């Protein structure tokens, strides 16, 4: 569970920010990207980007500014606010 996060709103925001252009994401129409990793079963993952422990606050911070957490990552900052990121994280954690 993500404090301050609404999974339904998060799914909508993931669509609005076009995360599916790079990621395949279950339950998001047209989210079939192949540039980034699939986000299927994201809620079962132990790590974000292979090295950052996957817990809700870290995931929200990652969504806001990936390069600040893992310099050299190919995932760009997309202009997502912290409240928006909490909603998006709430959705991603539901993917089992």
Where are the model-predicted features located?
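Flexible linker/context regions in extracytoplasmic redox proteins
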Residues: 2-5, 21, 58, 72
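Electrostatic cytochrome c docking/interface patches
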Residues: 1-15
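Extracytoplasmic/periplasmic, Sec-exported soluble proteins
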Residues: 2-6, 51, 80
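Residue-level signal for short amphipathic helical patches enriched in basic/charged
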Residues: 14-17, 70
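Axial heme c-ligation environment in periplasmic c-type cytochrome domains
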Residues: 21, 33-38, 42, 62-95
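Gly/Gly-Pro-rich "capping" loops immediately C-terminal to redox-active cysteine motifs
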Residues: 7, 11, 24-60
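Alpha-helix capping/termination and helix-coil
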Residues: 17-18, 46
């Amino acid at each position: 569970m993500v404090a301050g996060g609404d999974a339904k709103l998060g799914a909508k925001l993931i669509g609005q920010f076009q995360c599916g252009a790079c990621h395949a994401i279950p339950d998001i129409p047209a989210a079939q990207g192949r540039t980034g990793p699939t986000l299927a079963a994201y809620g079962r993952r132990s790590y974000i980007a292979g090295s950052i422990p996957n817990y809700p606050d870290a995931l929200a911070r990652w969504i806001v500014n990936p390069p600040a957490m893992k310099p050299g990552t190919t995932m760009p900052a997309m202009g997502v606010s912290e409240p928006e990121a909490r909603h998006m994280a709430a959705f991603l954690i539901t993917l089992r």
